[in-house]
Amino acid sequence: MKNIYDGLLSFKGEWRTYQQRVLREADAYMDDGRVHITAAPGAGKTVLGIELIRRTGKPCLILSPRIVIRQQWLERIRGSFFTEKAKTWEENEEQKILSSDIRYPGMITSITYQTLYSAMAGEKNVEESGEGEGTEEINFAGFEFLRQVKKAGIRTVCLDECHHLKNEWWKALEKFMDIEKDMTVIALTATPPYDSTPAQWERYTKMCGPVDAEITVPELVKEGSLCPHQDYVWFNCPSQEEGEKISQFRQNAANMFVFLMNDASLGEAAASHPALKDYEGYCDRMLENPGYLSGLLIYCQAKRIPFSRRWPEVLGVSEMPPVSEKWMEYFLQGFLYDDADSYQTDQKYREALKKQLREAGLTEKNKVHFLVNDKIEKMLVNSSGKMDSILKIASCEHTAMGEKLRMLILTDYIRGEYKSAVGHPEKDVGTMGVVPVFELLRRRGAGWRAGVLCGSLVILPDTAEEAFTEEILRIDPAASVPVFQKFRDAGGTAVGYSEVPVKGKLSLYTRAVTKIFERGYIQILVGTKSLLGEGWDSPGINSLILASTVGSYVLGNQMRGRAIRINPQDPEKVSNIWHLVCMSVPQEEKDRRRMGIEEPELSEDFYTLQRRMDGVLGVSYDGTVIENGLGRMQTIKKPFTKKHIEKINEDTACRSADRSRVAGQWKSALVKWNGREIADEFMADRKNFRPGVGFINALGVQIMIILGELLNIYLFLLRTGNASYVPFAGLTMIFLLLSYVSCGKIIRQLTPMWRFRGMSRGVLAALKKAGYITSGCEVISKEEDGLWFGTWLRGGTDREKNLYADTFAQMLAPVENQRYLLCHGGNVVRAKEYFCVPDIFASARDKAEIFRMELIPYIGKFRLVYTRNPEGRKILLHARAKAFSNKNERRRDRKKCVKGMLE
């Protein structure tokens, strides 16, 4: 088939090593009609996308999130791919090579997802043309979009950053792709939504296909496309006022717990639940929610209310734990809301109890909260103590960098109502936001030059006015001179800063502020993530504070991308990226016992940080490894007491000042990069793999196969008359039979690692048998720190590595609502051991059977159970109950790290 781009498009530059790697494998990725590439900021994903479009040789439709990105595609094609013939073609031919209007398509037509939606709906499309300046309007009434696509011969679709689209955009895109089924899809993103829900991820991969190739941050640092950098965390404890609110909440919970344990009416109501004595009649229903069932039984045990002993058995526990606030929360959720009709109690009593809990702050939106509520979590996320953290970080960085400091602080909100506090120290600025952060820096930072850049607000130091005006006139000689409105204190004295009214000139002012920031007239720039967190670049940034509450992988990586660009003016640039976390944990052992938690529950802020860091691949604090996750930041560890938090912060301040060490660690780690690859490693607690009946069964299968072969040889010798060999063969068989009888004792002494390694090989065998993995690759399994087993795929494509780790993780996942289970031992309903059939094998029984059969030599004979019929449903409920009671036993983890050939 003729390639329509021959002679018109040809890449003018030189492909970097990591780009060559992706392009070498691109043809293989295209086998299923989809290629999905993730590339860290700075990897040149746009030119990769253009090259892939060129290779398809067919007219293409490019879809982008915003107009500015839509235009960047066209500019990049003209600047990096247009040949002389293409330039002549554009001038003389009727059909253009490039277009941004689907009504008049070119060979390559670049539009936004919003335009696709409007064109599909046949309605007026109104979009901001970029950075809030003006709009672009097209009326698609009467326009036949699908007919135009067919007429233009468009057979390739390039999806740029196809994630977190508005729901109506998603629907339009899905409808379009359902109609145009034979399209070649090229999906490109810097930030795949790895942290999305399973349903969201399934929707995303159904559209884009599984990830085929990934260009990682370490590759870009090695090639000099990104600068060395390190992540740091600054912890704070709640302020006095916040601490008092937390203490009051916990005291309310403790008082309510004592009250409820002495409340005879609650005991009478609990005793009325018919399930306590009717196990057979209520088994299936109660097992739908094992947590609630456990809470009810634990409360009844504490109040000496009798119940069937079969309940603890089905939960897989020999003894119920003592009652605590945790279990009271489960019980009350059912009693008051989820299972209220099952209790014989006066409705007035129930309503009065609801009122008591609500007044104590222990219920929100029909949810019972004894450990922490949403209000407390939100307060901690927006803790005023983080303002003090920003000051301390700025002080550390200014001390270390001096005039070279170029710090960016990103927040969620402007908080323009605090402008009246600028220059008035008597006014409080304790709320997180652009203006409060700026004013705090102005008040406390003697000699710091701060500034603000937002969609509706620009604040500059008076010392930068002249430079700002010069930049404005340099960019646009016809522009009017900006107006500076000085901030003044109560006495009318100027405080050294002015507001510059934006008045529709945001694009111009953004460019000018960026320039004077890079020149040092502003050292600390404060802005919102919406304007500066994505699409805005200043290569001079060498320190970034993420004062945003956003925890998603996508936005977190977009914001980090601002700081790690190389700076041609500073070849030795090293960036620090700062994260803010507020910690609040019950410090007393007696508090934890009463609450029913073995270890302190960490704050939602901390879990947000964990989610962020799961999507970040970087060098560890000790410089020995490149991996993702919080584990590489070795100083961040328990106990998170106030004293230890202060110690962590002190260590962090010292580390952050030594940028040369960070550069050296990256250099050292990247020297070892040659011959290495990024491993997608799945890790599981070694306690999961105690040798047992299942493993003995597996070895038994292997021995029986050997015995069968020996029996065939023995019978063959008898038939052929080789009598001299018969006694030897007979003795061999007797020896192996005796060995088989005693193998149980032998195997029980073998290490759990043997079983884990066998399972890992079985998973790979199943994936190869089903045709999901076709390249030459091998499984590597090893024990880590004496606590974890890890496994990863060496060799193979990025997609295969990810698929292998996903499959193993799903096999060992807690039982919830999987379609198929593997069950071993016990009776028909209640097995001794369960494994989940991974999603990729669960779509049909024949696939699930492949998975089971390929695992037999490694884990023995397991029954395959379909959970969507009545019998399978019972097994699923029992398995789920067992998984809930033993949920800490199947601890799992996932990380990406650099592995060498000898590892």
Predicted segments with their positions:
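Post-DEXD/H (motif II) to motif III coupling segment of the RecA-like Helicase ATP-binding lobe
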Residues: K166-L226
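Conserved Walker A/P-loop ATP-binding site and its immediately adjacent core
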Residues: T46-F82, Q114-T115, W169, P192-S196, ...
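SF2 helicase catalytic motif II
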Residues: T115-L116, N125-A187
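Walker A/P-loop
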Residues: D31-L52
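Conserved C-terminal RecA-like helicase domain
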Residues: A40-A43, A86-T109, F143-E144, Q148, ...
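Conserved segment of the helicase C-terminal RecA-like domain
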Residues: R562-L602
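Conserved helix-turn-beta segment of the N-terminal RecA-like "Helicase ATP-binding" lobe
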Residues: V68-K96, S100-D101, T205-C208
